[in-house]
Amino acid sequence: AYPDEEVICITGEGSIQMCIQELSTCLQYGLPIKIINLNNAALGMVKQWQDMQYGGRHSSSTYENSLPDFVALTESYGHVGIKVSKFDELESAMKECISLKDKLVFLDVDVDPNEHVYPMLVAPNGSMKDMWISKNTKV
């Protein structure tokens, strides 16, 4: 839609795996997008629901050492992959990512698997009037 604009995709390892084959499309068309993969080794939203509503009983929401090496996978498509394992590595990795204007760059950023994201809509109805705004606050 905007070929002259910088495109940054912020995603998680669950969602990126649903369309990881598009790395081939990006190579074919020379699309220099930046992908920031927030990797918590889980289907984050599902795991968070299970933590909050089912006492932390996790069913089919964690990967338990079964994820691919996203850097190697990205590089196998001919793109640039960067692994960020520590918070103090993030700023320099982001600067490198943005500086590579003509390359697709995949930042695989490890995040705490126990960190939750808010606000969070509450199942089963998911109404905007029924959400968690913090671990202990539901509105």
Predicted feature locations:
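Thiamine diphosphate
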Residues: 1-139
